[in-house]
Amino acid sequence: MKKITVTLFLLLFANSVYSQKKPLDHSVYDSWKSVGSISMSDDGTFITYTVREQEGDGYVEVLNSKTLEKKSVQRAEQPVLTPDGKYLIASIKPFFAETKEAQRKKLKPDQMPKDTLGIYNCLTGELVKHPFLESFKKGLYGNKYIAYQTKMPADTTKGKEPVKKDKKAGSDLMVFHLESGTTDTLKAVSEYSFSLGGDSLFVVRRPGLQDSLLDAGLFMYTPKNKELRTIYTSDSGQTVKLPVISQDNRHLAFLVKPDSTKTGNDSASIFYYTEGFPSAEVLIENEHIKDGWQISDNREPVFSKSGHRIFFGIAPVRPVKDTTLLEADIARLDIWHYRDNYVQPQQLVNLKRELEKSYLCVADLGKEQEIRQLAQEEYPQVHVPCEHDADWGYSVSDYNYQLESMWSADPRADLYIINVTDGTSELVLKDHYISNVGASPEGKYLVWYNNLDSLWYSYNRANKKIVCITPDMPVSFANELHDTPEMARSYGYSAWAEGDKAVYLNDRYDVWQIDPSGQTPPVALTEGLGRREEITFRIARPDYVVYPPGVRRLEKETIKAGATVYFSAFDEKTKENGVYYTKTARRKSGKNDAMKACIKEPMTFNDLNRSTESGVICYIKHNFENSPDVWITKDKFKTQQKITDINPQQKLYNWGTAELIRWKSTFGRELEGILYKPENFDPARKYPMLVYFYERNSHTLYTYKSPAPSRSTINIPFFVSNEYLVFVPDIIYREGHPGQSALDCIVPGVEKLI
């Protein structure tokens, strides 16, 4: 009798808890947060991540992975953690409500609330602020210095005449030493950037009227000894761009162009500076370029990895703009012809890109100037492997097939190999359906996938032979779930082995180690475990450095012999996700280690980050019932520690569950879908049901969905919380019958549920 009483009490208590939970309404959206932008110090001690509200004030949190102590910097965005983990630099936004009120009052941009620079000491917890922030930068690997500029808000005092300023003039640049807290000021700076190591700061100076005694041009500032070195002194009206730096930090190159606002021409010259030069010298001018062409300022120069070559762009000279005519007197006319490669609306969309298009050229440093044009009209995009150090380049061109791209989903292309040493080219493939074209890191091979025969091929640069590298394979490399009226694409490739000895190709489930020369038999890096267990493995690079935009790092790091390789894992049967790992073969053994599972759970894992000097792994984990939160592991997932709880308010609401449903279509195919049910679901009740469908979605069974308005999908948490069922069925399309296919897949699934 006591057992019955206790059971009855627990049931009544559970029901009362469910009944106390509120349904979601539209007022709750702003309280829901998201987490992302994970960064980690090299030794794994400090981890930072950003927490954002849909509308509101977010923050950056700093975690000490050893003590699990957390500190937050309120309203911080764009966080940058120094590699040694000592400092976090971020832009601190104004209060959201303050910005919203300023927008409501329709204030001018210079009257809007300004950002603040925040410099947070991760060791002491001290936060230093510098108001009215306009921008800040740091060397990618730098630990000591940052630079920033501020902009004072407009003076809105009544009756006071605004001070007229030269809009092109530079402003003060502050160079801040993180350890000492001291600041150096550089005047009239319009642009600036650090070297990767952060030891040198390059500034473009453009003095205004108040700084008329200062020289304009490009300068290099060394914060350690406070030395400002002149690289180039510019004339009035010239525009000087920030330099590109060779990987050995010995060479600089930059563009200088005259004032082109009146003529519409973007002619430029390339200047060069290296150790021992008193100042920069002209390297390439338009007189070195063929008639009718000029150096383009729309393509930044780039040094080859060795620093022996420089690559840049040229473009046809455009007609000089007649500045004597008024805009109203200039006739504007768009002419279209039925044999144009693109229809007129697309031509207009592409106009800016076409006007800025340039063609790749190369010149050797230290030799008499010989400009070699690599790109041509027939193949306008040329890629040079080995970080521009290879003696060859390649181009995949649809030049001869652009017209048919308007109606064909399977575009054809030609493949060219270009000799970098003399600019000549060779057509190695004509009229082929190719994709996933890419060169090996050391430039020995070029690989591609043939969409027509579903095979991978390689081009050997040494002997110029093309071989099929996946003949007679027991698996297909074409998308096995492909169901649209076009050729099936491949699953791509993940990485290269050190020395270009292997390329890692993906099939539906496994990763294959393939010899690009075609001589060594293929080896399944994942041992065929994926196909046996129906688990999709993909190489993950949690310790791979993600370089910010603008940093030239063209090749991913190769996988070395004996290296530990991590894989993301997705179980097609259960929809669970996880992480596996193996070790590649050492040179002597010649055999890879067995696959080992770190973890597999009914969850989704995102943003895996591994410290470069320790075994700390930080990641985001979630499923439909559990909001995305930050977790860490120090022992390859044997134990996990949850770090955040960003949406505790979810417990107050009637949430939901996600369940995998299986059925057969009317044409006999096995299908899957997701049924979302309210948390307080009662199987004895009847519920209204919504059906949302779009291709396949069953793989998202363990994916969180924030309550939020959407223009394209339905708000599943909202409807489930308000006691609707939501059914999301997969659809398998049959060619030529999309509507009937959807009907044949969806209706049987709905009938099974009702």
Located regions from the model:
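Generic low-complexity, intrinsically disordered sequence content enriched
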Residues: L12-S16, L529, E723
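Serine-hydrolase catalytic core recognition
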Residues: K600, T604-I754
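Intrinsically disordered, low-complexity peptide-like regions
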Residues: F13-A14, P23, S458, D607, ...
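Bacterial Sec-dependent N-terminal signal peptides
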Residues: M1-K22
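Beta-propeller folds
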Residues: S19-S611, G615-V616, H622-P628, I632, ...
